[in-house]
Amino acid sequence: YRQIKEGRAQVMLTGGSEASVNEIGIAGFATLTALSPEKDPLKASLPFDRNRSGFVMGEGGATLVLENLEHAQKRNATILGEVVGYGSTCDAFHITSPDPTGEGAARAMKQAIDEAGITPDKVGYVNAHGTATHANDSGESLAINKVFGENSSVMVSSTKSMTGHLLGAAGAIEAAITVRALKMQQLPENVGLNELDEECNINIVTKDKTTTSNLEYAISNSLGFGGHNAVLALRKWSE
């Protein structure tokens, strides 16, 4: 994004892929007690739920073509969305755990929104990192409330409730999902939510809240181990 914005490139391919559902991958994350021990698939990946117990590993990938407007128009590309901001911070709190106050994640969201040249109230949807671990979901909820306010109407969901955690591919596929949400004006549901954790005081996208008609801006959060926080601000494309 920055390479293109600052004129060092016209077009770049970005993305990630992951295929780590194997003995070593599972053993490593199990040792960290990050994986859900639930055997029932319907109870295994429950972002923001009171009874969440960890994440489910997933496999997959996504590639996004980023290019400047002139380049896209010259080749008659179908433009799906616009990247308008980016934020990046590091908690420097713990080797794996995020800062429980959500301070670093909040700063990354604020950076992305500021670069987009908008105020937080213009953002209608947050694609949360939402791993279904206790530490991430409670801390990320605090961070969202720091940025948008506790009584904000911004809608939030974690698509890891459907895809599992794609690890190195999570950011790419969740950015693609967020772009599609903007284009289709359809918010992805946070499936599997039975009882919202009181520590996660945010507006979750449930089955009856997926349709929207005025979604112009959204952000996608990627909050990695060790508090490595990256946030994309995206805008619905219009001529």
What are these regions (language model features)?
Residues Y1-K43, S152, E174, E239:
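Cys-dependent condensing catalytic cores that perform Claisen condensation/acyl-transfer
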Residues Y1-E18, V56-A77, H165-L187, L232:
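Active-site-proximal alpha-helical scaffold in enzymes
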Residues A19-S45, G87-R107, T131-A143, M184-Y217:
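Active-site-adjacent elements of ketosynthase-type condensing enzymes
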Residues F29, V65, V83, V123, ...:
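Conserved small-residue
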Residues A116-K122, N201-E239:
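Flexible, low-complexity linker/loop segments at domain and module junctions
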Residues D40-A116, Y125, E239:
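Condensing-enzyme catalytic core mediating Claisen C-C bond formation in acyl metabolism
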Residues T31-V56, S141-A172:
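Conserved catalytic cysteine-centered active-site region
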Residues A9-S17, T78-Y86, D121-A128, V154-S161, ...:
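Beta-strand segments within the central parallel beta-sheet cores of soluble alpha/beta enzyme folds
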